[in-house]
Amino acid sequence: MNYLIIPAYQPDLNLVKLVRLVHAKSDLNIIVVDDGSDADKKVIFDKFEGLATVLTHEHNQGKGQALKTAYAYILERGTYGSIVTADADGQHKIWDIFRVVKQSQEHPGALILGARAFSGKVPLRSAFGNKLTRFLFKQQTGVAVSDTQTGLRAFTTN
């Protein structure tokens, strides 16, 4: 069983478009984690009935905890397959989501990272953070990656 996890805090209609498109074009089990969004965003999460499983945090706990909540949900089911994470803002193209799923299936045990094409001006804080984490990641693993902060990731559960 393959999963798409989308952590969401204060999402807009881009999330609805993404969920509907992925549901229509794939057999991925979609999990959306509402990470403590305001009450007015409930109308967005209500649109996922029959399309996705919605897990809810009462208060914002951050993207990392939202991912852990979804991982725990999958672990409770005891199923094996691929897990893909994508951002709720619609920045990841659907074919890129499917591409990283395929790569994770072809390379079990590997971490597949989508890489963003940076164009234009990147905020100094973001550029510094990505540069620092790329350096630390390479020091720790010996593997060079171009974008450690990408929200598009895939790996297998086994």
Give the role of each language-model region.
Residues 59, 65-73, 94-158:
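Acceptor/aglycone-binding surface of glycosyltransferases and processive sugar-polymer synthases
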Residues 10, 35-39, 61, 70:
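Conserved short acidic donor-positioning loop in nucleotide-sugar-dependent glycosyltransferases
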Residues 34-42, 90-91:
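A conserved acidic beta->alpha catalytic loop
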Residues 45-77:
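Conserved donor nucleotide-binding strand/loop of the catalytic core
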Residues 2-11, 18:
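A conserved hydrophobic helix/loop-capping motif in glycosyltransferases and polysaccharide synthases
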Residues 14-17, 38-47:
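Acidic helix N-cap motif at the loop->helix transition within catalytic regions
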Residues 20-29:
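Short, acidic, metal-binding catalytic loop of nucleotide-sugar glycosyltransferases
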Residues 80-91:
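Short beta-strand-to-loop acidic/aromatic patch adjacent to the donor-nucleotide binding site
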